[in-house]
């Protein structure tokens, strides 16, 4: 099957916009297609970007094109599928995964390091994300901007992401750029431009992100930041991953160097390369560029287990920017690779995925006590399969001001109870499993997304088998397993609730910024 970004359908859809290839709109759409991830947050960000930056005529065309592309992805056959994939470990500990995709003369690279929010030192909240930014500040050999010129000059794209259990750096470009990209990735694995100026610049950027995405946004990501802080008891799982300003301001160059030396080692990294390549040729190139990087001790994995939760946890917050109340509900989930993990993923999708989901139908359509429902396992910062420590099934519900929290919870509990007592219908189960599988296969058809998935799997499990096995294993999940999972995990004593309500405006004045 052709990858989505190079399929005739996708190319025709892009061409239909008739935008100059040098235009910003064209680049945004192409970047979105190349980096397509099946997550609600990516969709929301894309929609916001086109709403802000483009006139109505262009917005409509892009929206039609993007919607059609989603249909193309969802229509990919849900059948067992495995791409040719090989793996090798260098003498310095770097693990390399290569997967072939000859549908277009392009490649995707993902370098994932085994460091994320969860492992940040105490007193240095937000440091993993801050360091991700510093990785784009250049090195003595390749100053800031070189990476962008090499990749974007050929029509490619690059980015970085920090999550609970990994930080990844991704690039996609024409195959002619493979050697320069490998050289640059090796160069920044060897050293960085450690300067107070770079630290100050990126600290300011991260703090501005916090202001824009948290302090000055309705709800302030409370379902992603505040909820884990209430649901978990230990620092690795409960602290604010975006970072407290006092911790960010306290970061020193010595902290940056120590963090880099400890976590950005070859033995703590997995590089996956997917595209128009031959494994042995890629292994030789990686050995050429990365083989001389000295090995360093790999940091031990700390224990991040949580003590059992024995009672429901409930709290309330006020929000100066929200106009209607919001409710966040989190249930603790089974560990990664647990026998219950697949049933957890399916249950999360049955409850939250789309307007046919159990919660949308019960709360929005039938009882009319909610305006919107979203959520899932490991939501919103990951997939149900990519975590290496405690995580939650999250429900984020926005509800009308004339409805009470108890009314929302009564309808919510009724929907969950019905699933726990009766399980899903076979028709509902077949529908959601088919959608999950087609989404996963469609995702794997895009080289950069496959590279990302492969690198995460090897980082967590030591092999890439789960990338190709999970879609097939999903088809074996039964209604009885979903019913048993809901009865075991979706219980009141295993959940945490935060109710966030609009704050009253100050008397005689306008509301100030800051959503918390």
Where are each of the predicted segments found?
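Low-acidity, Ser/Thr- and Arg-rich intrinsically disordered low-complexity segments
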Residues: 3-8, 18, 23
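Bacterial N-terminal signal peptides that target proteins for export
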Residues: 40, 44-65
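Short hydrophobic alpha-helical segments enriched in small aliphatic residues
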Residues: 15, 25-27, 33, 39
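Proteolytic maturation boundary segments
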Residues: 65, 75-97, 278-319, 330, ...
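Non-catalytic, conformational "gating/processing" segments within enzyme and secreted inhibitor domains
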Residues: 196, 203, 212, 220, ...
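M16 family metallopeptidases and their MPP-like homologs
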Residues: 97-99, 104-122, 126-130, 144-189, ...
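His/Glu-based metal-binding/catalytic segments typifying zinc-dependent metallopeptidases
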Residues: 101, 229, 298-358, 362
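Histidine-acidic residue clusters that define the catalytic metal-binding segment
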Residues: 79-89, 228-269, 279, 301-306, ...
């Amino acid at each position: 099957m052709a990858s989505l970004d190079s399929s005739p359908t996708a190319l025709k859809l892009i061409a239909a916009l008739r935008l100059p290839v040098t235009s910003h709109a064209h680049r945004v759409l192409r970047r979105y297609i190349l980096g397509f991830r099946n997550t609600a947050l990516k969709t929301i960000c894309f929609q916001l970007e086109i709403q802000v930056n483009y006139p109505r005529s262009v917005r409509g065309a892009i929206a039609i094109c993007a919607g059609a592309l989603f249909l193309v992805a969802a229509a990919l056959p849900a059948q067992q599928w495995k791409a040719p994939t090989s793996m090798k470990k260098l003498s310095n500990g770097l693990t390399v995964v290569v997967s072939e995709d000859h549908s277009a003369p392009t490649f995707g690279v993902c370098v994932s390091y085994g460091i994320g929010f969860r492992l940040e030192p105490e007193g240095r909240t937000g440091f993993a994300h801050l360091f991700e930014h510093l990785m784009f500040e250049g090195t003595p050999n390749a100053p800031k901007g070189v990476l962008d010129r090499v990749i974007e000059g050929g029509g490619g794209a690059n980015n970085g992401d920090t999550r609970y259990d990994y930080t990844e750096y991704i690039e996609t470009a024409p195959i002619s750029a493979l050697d320069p990209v490998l050289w640059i990735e090796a160069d920044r694995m060897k050293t960085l431009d450690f300067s107070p100026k770079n630290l100050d610049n990126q600290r300011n950027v991260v703090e501005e992100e916090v202001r824009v995405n948290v302090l000055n946004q309705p709800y302030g990501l409370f379902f992603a930041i505040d909820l884990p802080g209430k649901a978990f008891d230990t620092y690795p799982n409960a602290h604010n991953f975006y970072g407290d300003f006092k911790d960010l301001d306290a970061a020193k160059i010595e902290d940056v160097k120590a963090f880099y030396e400890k976590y950005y080692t070859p033995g703590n990294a997995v590089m996956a390369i997917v595209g128009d390549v031959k494994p042995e040729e890629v292994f030789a190139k990686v050995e050429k560029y990365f083989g001389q990087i000295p090995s360093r001790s790999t940091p031990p994995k700390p224990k991040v287990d949580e003590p059992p939760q024995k009672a429901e946890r409930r709290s309330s917050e006020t929000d100066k920017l929200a106009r209607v109340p919001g409710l966040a509900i989190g249930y603790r989930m089974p560990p990664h690779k647990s026998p219950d993990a697949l049933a957890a993923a399916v249950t999360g999708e049955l409850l939250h995925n789309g307007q046919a989901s159990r919660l949308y139908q019960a709360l929005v359509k039938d009882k009319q006590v909610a305006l919107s429902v979203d959520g899932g396992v490991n939501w919103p910062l990951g997939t149900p399969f990519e975590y290496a420590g405690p995580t939650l099934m999250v429900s984020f519900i926005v509800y009308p001001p004339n409805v009470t929290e108890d009314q929302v919870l009564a309808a919510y509990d009724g929907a969950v109870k019905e699933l726990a007592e009766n399980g899903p219908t076979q028709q509902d189960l077949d529908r959601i499993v088919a959608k999950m599988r087609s989404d996963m296969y469609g995702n794997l058809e895009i080289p950069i997304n496959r590279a990302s998935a492969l690198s995460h799997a090897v980082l967590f499990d030591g092999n890439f088998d789960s990338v190709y096995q999970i879609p097939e294993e999903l088809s074996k999940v039964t209604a009885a397993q979903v019913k048993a999972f809901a009865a075991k995990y979706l219980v009141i004593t295993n959940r945490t609730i935060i109710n966030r309500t609009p704050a009253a405006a100050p008397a005689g004045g306008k509301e100030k910024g800051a959503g918390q």
